[in-house]
Amino acid sequence: MDQFIKQDETGDLIETGMNVANHFLSAPIQGTNSLSKATIIPGVAPVLIGNPEQKNIQYPTASHQGSKSKGRGSGAKPIIVSSSEGGTGGTQIPEPLFAQTGQGGVVTTVYQDPTIQPTGSYRSVELAKIGKERMINRFVEKPRTSTPVTEFKRGGGRERLPKARQSKRRA
């Protein structure tokens, strides 16, 4: 058996591969079927401006904006903390890291106000902060309260064994 590919076989393989690549490059791309998504949100991926799907994106006009689906809302929905959960009741807290689209398709992010202390349903957030703090401080070198053992010997040392045990070991 010949384990090596000959020079002419290598040329044939490269030519076949190039023919396959040229076939797929010359084939027409049918709009949104190539990404398996309906459309690309304008402004999210400015790198993809020259993509084949760009010509098939339909931008909403003024007549279509009123008929948005109820599944998605535009803008951040604030979370209202009720007075039964404790703390100050009725205060609005913006949902942390909620991405929303502004004008012109620019994506902006709303962050939670750091001055508002989490209460009620945010107790888990506070516990997570404490857990993170403990994990970070866990491996920090702290001063020792006890003196370290300096006379540790591997194997136990035979010179300190009682005479009864030494006689058993020799046997």
Curated annotation (Swiss-Prot):
Which portions of the sequence form the region Disordered? 57-100, 143-171
Q: Which portions of the chain have biased composition (kind: Basic and acidic residues)?
A: 151-162
Per the record, the similarity remark reads:
Belongs to the Orthorubulavirus I protein family.
Q: What is this protein called?
A: I
Q: Which organism is the protein's source?
A: Mumps virus genotype N (strain L-Zagreb vaccine)
